[in-house]
Amino acid sequence: MKHLEKIKLIQGGMGVHVSNWRLARAVAMQRPGVTVGTVSGTALDIVYVRLLQLGDPGGHARRALRSLDEQFDVDIGRRICERYFIEGGKAPQDRFRSAPMQIVRAHDGRRTFPMPNGSAVTTPLKLDDEIIELLIATGFVEVWLAKEGHNGKIFINFLNKIELPLIYVLYGAMLAGVDGVIVGAGNPEGLPALCRRLATHEAVAHEISVLYRETGEEFVIAFDPKEIAGARFAAKPLETPVFLAIVSLEDLVKALAESPSAPPDGFIIEHHTAGGHNANPIGPLRRDARGQPIYSSRDEANLAAIRAVGIPFWLAGGYGSHARLQEALAAGANGVQVGTVFALAEESGMKPEYRSAILAALKDGVKDEDLVQTTVFSPTGFSFKVVQIQETLSDDDVYASRRRICDIGMLQQRGFGKPDEQGERTLFQRCPAGPIENFVKNRGLERNTDERRCLCNGLLACVGLGQVKEIQGEVVEEPAIVTLGNHLDGVRRLSRQGQTHYYVQDVIADILG
């Protein structure tokens, strides 16, 4: 854990493939040990299934999949390529073939469950083996590519709310030697200990949420690494990555520090001005005249209390400058985590047209508060920052004209229907951003679908991997959704008010000096 002490700048994990292996690798190579690159662990199965169908530009995915097969004497990578790779890429008008939906089942394949008899019961659930292999492989690929050819540190970021793929992608990342794990959007209790068990290939179980369960019922994703690929992955122990929990207030810091299983190795204290998902304001939701949620002093972290816990921490949310780094260090932090200014660097995975649109808005004098707004768009229920760009999902007309569909399902909720006459309950999966009738049919309230927008398809479109369809002879791509933090001063400074593009090395020099 000694390398944590040197880390001054962590590049944040962002969106779906915005903080991809290229960006993370560039950051990690700048000042090894001081700067850390972070890849996003979100939707990697979808990302690589689609990249392979685009012909795998540069051959990077296939190279990493070959390394997986050769290193562990498996044929998982070969089978993935056979299934999805298209030489020269698919035709622009052709739809992407879908990765398998992550449908959770009992270990015997059932999706119906009897009512419990009143005693406490833990039920293990799993995904299909094909999906598990794809998740492990793509977690490996992203980290392997990020770590290739240098000795810098690479972390991987997860949203705790995306529960089903987490432990499988994490295991794949660990097979590739990931140096650290960052988890936000929820309480990550139990995950630091789970990392340690995965390092020795032990069977693990991670609790997941299931709505309308009975008192005393618990459901877990259960995974035994030795049951995959003939136990070939389990031939020798792995390095245990450091674990950082993203939190907003000192209460969760104290609770996790006293974890009965294992505390995190560090914390990222994220202010509500950071991009992506944020904690909601404490207490009843109030809005200002512009419709933005009102945060108060109750939503500000007590840094003295966090410092007293004695575990390293980094500050995030508006810390993308040398002056703010110095403030963080003076407050007792080890350093800062920065996202927004990296998201607009040339190495990021954001589609160039959206980077250019944002820089053009800055050049035209659009104010930060008009360009980035806090919304209730996310199906998670967390606040979510959205950049206001025409012809994206930030546009109400675009949202209204898009047919609701849930064909990826990363943010689906799981729950039980009402028991039948035999006391059997069917496990459903639903999303507030999906078809309203399906949400209501599965015990949802229609009002909870208001303003909910499809982040899965929107964030994939943000990085040029949006699904396509043909409408009256015209190829139409899913509308994108773009997220940044509230503070764009670093972007303004480096781009000279939107007049020029910039690179990772410029960001590092600007923040670290």
Named regions from a protein language model:
Residues M1-A308, N486-G513:
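Active-site entrance/lid segments in N-terminal catalytic domains of soluble metabolic enzymes
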Residues I10, A43-L44, R66, P264, ...:
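Conserved active-site-proximal phosphate/metal-binding subdomains
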Residues V27, A328-L329:
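Hydrophobic residues within well-ordered alpha-helices
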